[in-house]
UniProtKB/Swiss-Prot annotation:
PROSITE patterns assigned: MFS, SUGAR_TRANSPORT_1
Function: Multidrug resistance transporter involved in resistance to the antifungal drugs miconazole, tioconazole, clotrimazole, and ketoconazole; as well as to quinidine. Decreases the intracellular accumulation of clotrimazole in and plays a role in the extrusion of this antifungal from preloaded cells.
Keywords: Cell membrane, Glycoprotein, Membrane, Transmembrane, Transmembrane helix, Transport
Alphabetical list of InterPro entries matching this protein: MFS, MFS_dom, MFS_trans_sf, Sugar_transporter_CS
Subcellular location: Cell membrane
Residues that span the membrane, as ranges: 88-108, 121-141, 148-168, 178-198, 208-228, 238-258, 323-342, 354-374, 432-452, 458-478, 493-513, 524-544
UniProt GO BP: xenobiotic detoxification by transmembrane export across the plasma membrane
Similarity annotation: Belongs to the major facilitator superfamily. CAR1 family.
Protein name as annotated: Multidrug transporter QDR2
Gene Ontology CC terms, in alphabetical order: plasma membrane
Gene3D superfamilies referenced in this protein's UniProt entry, alphabetically: MFS general substrate transporter like domains
Disulphide bonds in the chain: none
Gene for this chain: QDR2
Length: 583
C-alpha cells in the first residue's frame, strides 16, 4: 500500500438522531476513513454529541454493516465506573506504599543505626524497581491479558508486606522493598491498559482522571496514615496495614476483576479460553446478559500481539513518546524529591513528631488529588470543544474549495484526503495546557526550597508544597491520556515505559538529594530542578507544532508494513494451497 494512498478523510456530515449511537473503532491506529462511513458518529453523553468517523482500512475487503455494528465496548457506564473503582483500589497500594513510608524515615534511621543516605536508599530502590517491573510486566499484560498479571502482582505485594512487617535487619528491608515495588507497580500501567480497552478517545480523559485521582489518594493520605499507625503501634504496623489491605484487594480481584484485553475478549462479549482470565463474577446471569457472553461478537476481537518483554525499548524510538518521557519524567522526579526532602526537613529543621509530619503531608496530597481529577475532566471538556470547532471549520473549508476554487465534490474530497492539515490535531488537544502547569509547578518548587533555606514559618513551606503539587501532576494525566491514544492496543507497554523513565529519574534525584543539599542547600537544589523542569518543557513546542504530521507519517509506515506482511502471508498461503492441490 503506497504512502500517498493512506491518509485520513474529513470529519464531515451530521449525526442522524434517529439512528443508534455507534462507538468509534478505537483499536490499533489506522490511517484511513471510508467516505461511506463519514456520517456515522458517536455520542459520548446525554447532553452533548461528539461526532467522529468510523475508522477502517482499505485492506478490509468486507463492507461492515455499520447500523448493526456491535458497540466498541459492552461495558456500560456503570460497569466502567465499577472497573475504575476496582483498578483504583488496586493501584492505591502502589501510591500508598511510597507515601506511607515517608514519615518513618527518621524512625528507620534511628532503629537500625544508619545514616540519612542509607535510609534514602530504601526509597531509591523502591523507585528503581517501581520503574523496571512495569516495563517487563506490561508486555505480559498486553499478550497474556490484564487479569492474570494483576493477580500475580497483588500476590507478590501481599507477601512482601508481610515480610517487611517481620524484617529484623536493614538488608532485609532493602530487599523486601525491592520485591514490594516490583510486585505492585505494574498495576498502574495495567490500569491504563484496562481503561484503554473499554473507553473511546472522547471519554478516555475523564476516566483516566478518575482512576488517577482515586489512586493518588494513597499519596494524599498515605503519609497521614503512616504517621498515625507508627506513632501508635510502631513502624511495623504500616506494613501490616498494607498486607491486610492488599489481601482484601486480592480477594476482590480474584472474584470480580474481568479480563478486558481486546485480543482475548473483544468488546467484552467473548468468553476467554484460559480459565485464569475468567472472573467468577461472569457466571451470574445478569452479567452474562449485559456483556452478551451467550452471543459473543467475535468480529470485535483484535489480532494477538507477540510476547516481547523488551517492547518498551522499541516504543522509545517513537518521537512523541520520547518527548513526553523526558518532560513528564523530570516533573514527577522533582515532585518525588520534594516529598522525600519534606520528611527530613520537618524532622530535623522543625523538630516535629512523626504524627505531625504526617499531618504536614496533607496539603501536598490533597492538592495532588485536585490536580489529577481536575486535569482529567478538563481533557474531556477540551476534546469535545475542540472537536466540535474542528468539524465546523472543516465544513467551511469544504465550501470554500467548492465555491471559490470551482472544485467538484470529488476533487475536494481528494484534496482533504491528502492534506494533513485537515486532520483533527489530537496532540494539541491533549497538550496545549501543559506549559502553564509546568511553569507554575516549577516556580512553586523553587519557592519551596528557598522557604526551607531561610527557615520561613512552617505554614509558608506547606503552602508552597501544596501550590507546586497542585500543578505538578497535570502533565502526567496529559501524557498518559495521549500515550493511550497513540498506542490503544499496547497501553500497558507504553505507560510502563513512561513509568520506567519517571521512576528511574526519581531514584537518581533522591539518591543525590542528601549530597546536593549539603553542597547547594535546598534552595539551590530546587532552583536547579525547577530550571530543569522548565527546560524539559521546550521540546513540547516542537511536538505541538509537528506532532500531527509525525503521528500520521508513522501510522502510514506501520500500515504499509502490515499490508506488506499480509500480502506475503497471502502469497505463502496461496502457494501452499497450490502445492497441496498438486499432490
Amino acid at each position: 500500500m503506497m504512502e500517498d494512498q493512506q491518509s485520513l478523510h474529513s470529519f464531515i456530515s451530521d449525526y442522524d438522531q434517529r439512528s443508534h449511537a455507534v462507538e468509534k473503532y478505537d483499536g490499533p491506529d489506522l490511517s484511513e476513513v471510508d467516505s461511506e462511513d463519514n456520517d456515522k458518529m458517536i455520542k459520548t453523553n446525554e447532553d452533548e454529541a461528539v461526532k467522529e468517523p468510523i475508522y477502517r482500512t482499505r485492506s478490509n475487503q468486507t463492507e461492515p454493516d455499520i447500523a448493526n455494528a456491535p458497540p466498541y465496548s459492552r461495558f456500560d457506564a456503570k460497569y466502567k465506573m465499577a472497573l475504575v473503582l476496582q483498578c483504583a483500589y488496586t493501584g492505591l497500594f502502589s501510591t500508598m506504599a511510597g507515601a506511607i513510608y515517608y514519615p518513618v524515615l527518621s524512625v528507620i534511621e534511628k532503629q537500625f543505626h544508619i545514616t540519612e543516605e542509607l535510609v534514602n536508599i530504601t526509597v531509591v530502590v523502591y523507585f528503581i524497581f517501581q520503574g523496571i517491573a512495569p516495563t517487563l510486566m506490561g508486555g505480559l499484560a498486553d499478550s497474556l491479558g490484564r487479569r492474570p498479571v494483576v493477580l500475580f502482582a497483588v500476590t507478590v505485594y501481599f507477601g512482601a508486606c508481610i515480610g517487611l512487617a517481620c524484617a529484623q535487619t536493614y538488608a532485609q528491608i532493602v530487599v523486601l522493598r525491592c520485591l514490594q515495588a516490583a510486585g505492585i507497580s505494574p498495576v498502574i500501567a495495567i490500569n491504563s491498559g484496562i481503561i484503554g480497552d473499554v473507553t473511546t478517545r472522547a471519554e478516555r480523559g475523564g476516566y483516566v482522571g478518575y482512576i488517577s485521582g482515586f489512586q493518588v489518594l494513597g499519596s494524599a493520605f498515605g503519609a497521614l496514615i503512616g504517621a498515625g499507625l507508627s506513632s501508635r503501634w510502631g513502624w511495623r504496623s504500616i506494613f501490616w496495614f498494607l498486607a491486610i489491605g492488599s489481601g482484601v484487594c486480592l480477594v476482590f480481584s480474584i472474584i470480580m476483576l474481568p479480563e478486558t484485553k481486546r485480543t482475548i475478549v473483544g468488546n467484552g462479549s467473548v468468553t476467554p479460553r484460559n480459565y485464569l482470565n475468567r472472573a467468577p463474577l461472569l457466571m451470574f446471569p445478569l452479567i452474562r446478559r449485559k456483556l452478551h457472553l451467550d452471543d459473543p461478537e467475535y468480529e470485535t476481537l483484535e489480532p494477538r500481539t507477540q510476547l516481547s518483554l523488551l517492547a518498551p525499548l522499541s516504543i522509545l524510538k517513537v518521537k512523541e513518546i520520547s518527548i513526553l518521557l523526558v518532560t513528564a519524567g523530570i516533573q514527577f522526579a522533582t515532585w518525588s524529591t520534594h516529598q522525600t526532602a519534606l520528611s527530613t526537613v520537618l524532622s530535623k529543621n522543625y523538630h516535629l513528631s512523626v504524627a505531625k509530619i504526617g499531618l504536614c503531608y496533607l496539603p501536598t496530597g490533597i492538592c495532588t488529588l485536585i490536580s489529577i481529577v481536575t486535569s482529567g475532566r478538563y481533557l474531556n471538556w477540551s476534546y469535545r470543544r475542540r472537536f466540535a470547532k474542528h468539524k465546523v471549520w472543516l465544513k467551511e473549508q469544504e465550501e470554500i474549495l467548492v465555491k471559490e476554487n470551482g472544485y467538484s465534490r470529488e476533487e475536494v474530497q481528494n484534496i482533504i484526503n491528502n492534506d494533513p492539515k485537515y486532520v483533527f490535531n489530537l496532540v494539541q488537544t491533549r497538550l496545549h495546557a501543559a506549559f502553564v502547569t509546568l511553569l507554575l509547578s516549577s516556580s512553586g518548587f523553587v519557592a519551596f526550597g528557598w522557604c526551607i533555606d531561610v527557615k520561613a514559618p512552617l505554614a509558608s513551606v506547606l503552602v508552597m508544597s501544596g501550590f507546586a503539587s497542585l500543578f505538578s501532576n497535570c502533565i502526567l494525566t496529559f501524557s498518559t491520556t495521549l500515550i493511550v491514544d497513540i498506542f490503544p492496543s499496547k497501553t500497558s507497554t507504553a505507560t510502563g515505559c513512561l513509568n520506567l523513565f519517571r521512576c528511574l529519574l526519581s531514584a537518581l534525584f533522591i539518591g543525590c538529594l542528601s549530597k546536593m543539599a549539603t553542597s547547594m542547600t535546598y534552595g539551590g537544589v530546587f532552583t536547579f530542578l525547577g530550571a530543569l523542569t522548565a527546560l524539559s518543557a521546550c521540546p513540547l513546542f516542537y511536538l505541538l507544532k509537528n506532532g500531527r504530521e509525525i503521528t500520521l507519517k508513522r501510522k502510514r509506515k506501520e500500515d504499509a508494513s502490515r499490508a506488506f506482511a499480509l500480502s506475503v502471508a497471502n502469497e505463502k498461503a496461496e502457494a501452499e494451497g497450490k502445492a497441496e492441490e498438486s499432490r
